[in-house]
UniProtKB/Swiss-Prot annotation:
Disulfide bonds: none annotated. This is Transposase InsN for insertion sequence element IS911. InterPro entries: Homeodomain-like_sf (IPR009057), RD_transcriptional_regulator (IPR051839), Transposase_8 (IPR002514). Pfam families: HTH_Tnp_1. It comes from Shigella dysenteriae. Involved in the transposition of the insertion sequence IS911. Belongs to the transposase 8 family. Keywords: DNA recombination, DNA-binding, Transposable element, Transposition. The keyword Membrane does not apply. GO terms for biological process: DNA transposition.
Length: 112
């Protein structure tokens, strides 16, 4: 039988969503303020494995590694947004190239 995680009262726990800012500030307790992972997790009321993951992600992002999860540092958030924008612009450029070629082809055929 598979059981879902439960809180102290025995009721099923709801998945909590945390903002990038909350994750970053929580991880900074360990990385910048020398808290232990356990102390930071307790102070921020999150699980130990969650805090460990956030600390690893913050360290990776500060080293310039692109995160697999949603980025938490402002720089990585901006990089992700810029990549999406670049991808959209490249797609629009391809569409314009094809449209131009089609229009040129039509104008050549109609002039004959």
């Amino acid at each position: 039988m598979i059981c879902s995680p439960q809180n102290n009262t025995g009721a099923p726990m709801k998945k909590r969503n945390f903002s990038a800012e909350f994750k970053r500030e929580s991880a900074q307790l360990v990385v910048d303020q020398n808290y232990t992972v356990a102390d930071a997790a307790k102070a921020m009321d999150v699980g130990l494995s969650t805090m460990t993951r956030w600390v690893k992600q913050l360290r990776d992002e500060r080293q310039g590694k692109t995160p697999k999860a949603s980025p938490i540092t402002p720089e990585q958030i901006e990089i992700r947004e810029l990549r999406k924008k670049l991808q959209r612009i490249e797609m629009e450029n391809e569409i314009l190239k094809k449209a131009t070629a089609l229009l040129m082809s039509d104008s050549l055929n109609s002039s004959r």
